Amino acid sequence: MNISIFLIGFVFFMGGISVWLMPTFKLGIFFLEWDFLSLKFNFYFNSILFSFILFLVTFSVLVFSTYYLNSELNFNYYYFVLLIFVGSMFSLNFSNSIFTMLLSWDLLGISSFFLVLFYNNWDSCSGAMNTALTNRLGDYFMFVFFGLSVFSGYYFLSFSMFSSYMSLLLLLTAFTKSAQFPFSSWLPKAMSAPTPVSSLVHSSTLVTAGLILLMNFNNLVMQKDFISFVLIIGLFTMFFSSLASLVEEDLKKVVALSTLSQMGFSMVTLGLGLSFISFIHLVSHALFKSCLFMQVGYIIHCSFGQQDGRNYSNNGNLPNFIQLQMLVTLFCLCGLIFSSGAVSKDFILELFFSNNYMMFFSLMFFVSVFLTFGYSFRLWKSFFLSFNKVMNHYSSTVFMNFLSLVLVIFSISFLWWMNFNLLNIPSLFLYVDFFGPLVFLFMMIFLSFLILKMLFKELMYKFLVDYLAKNSIYKMKNLKFMDLFLNNINSKGYTLFLSSGMFKNYYLKSLNFNSVVVLIFIFFMIC
């Protein structure tokens, strides 16, 4: 136990030193250099920072897996495939050659297929096949892209002639891996995987691979037509995934659609030409989304696998520390002020609305950001503000309370620390003038919410029919209980009426009541 604590402390100490040295650290290593076969890795600021976050999330997920999959027979198989999955993401992050990038990209898709297929039921089989086929389509685009690049390098083809087509292939490759519109269908279906896998996939591995690829080819993508195309695709992904998360009942799919919305947000940032700010938002999202998935997975696991949000209630029995962690991660997801989500989101919103885009796109972007609060509150309401019943058993252990404490601390403070030491991103937080428009913005949102509530009261019909009727049927289905309840009401009601009647008769016969009647009669006669 002491050795493990020492190793964990040593790893975090070395990670802190690496973060401290990151701004001035540049290193390139090649193990083999022979024509096409090149094993070359670059260690730059972005790659080291992302690998540090990936290591932190992976460590928390591996520890959480020992709790979540404790009784699984294929646990060793799961660990083996998961380590291949994480290793391929590390390799893709550091790779600087065609061979290593193709190898890492292919391993990432194959290992994700086996992880989604872990439970081996109908949902996992269909989800794994959908994931594999969509990623295979992206692999095809990537092979064609690198093939054209190799021929252009050997001067068989003109690079200027094929650069636009190659850039389009690169964009399609990133869109399939990051589940952008119209390749978004595989991401909710991949929720049939175990929750620790979902926590890793949706935070810092599979869905971020496409964005990492575009950032590596930043000079090729940053053309006027292509960044406008990236911006529009990111807007559509963000808008439709936010709308879908408001009507989805599966809680894991709600969190998955929120991930899709944030990936669209990062793609919009990349379309603005802010590749580094998009990377910073990816880092922030990886921290709090992995923690949110762990909290949701813990609640689902303690509720015996119940994922329907309509059947949850009375989760106040959860450990208070777990509730606090979930609330903090939802605050970071919304981008509330003084959270890590606000650091990147504020700067992105400022730069988006400072540009003169079409009114339609600006309105779509504003509605999509506003819907983030909608599905975050819906997720909180499903767990803690509902009135339906589901069987649950919560184990309030110290291990589960402090499992994702490191992720929560980093979600709150890491980007703020980077802001004051490395980045200098949101200088608006230093000025009082920023808070004036913020107050008016909150007032507009509040008034819009009240108007929508008054205009769309007919939407309550679904709630009254589906939720209240179901709850009433659940309470009235035990007829023996109803008989005893009515019998108890009859006996106690008869006793109550009998005692009150005897009291009235006694009071009416008394002298005091007669005196009061005489005084009232005299008063009316005088008036």
Curated annotation (Swiss-Prot):
Belongs to the complex I subunit 5 family. It is a multi-pass membrane protein. This is NADH-ubiquinone oxidoreductase chain 5. The chain crosses the membrane at residues 3-23, 43-63, 75-95, 98-118, 141-161, 168-188, 197-217, 226-246, 263-283, 318-338, 357-377, 398-418, 432-452, 507-527. It is found in: Mitochondrion inner membrane. GO terms for molecular function: NADH dehydrogenase (ubiquinone) activity. The keyword Transport applies. The lineage of its organism: Eukaryota, Metazoa, Ecdysozoa, Nematoda, Chromadorea.
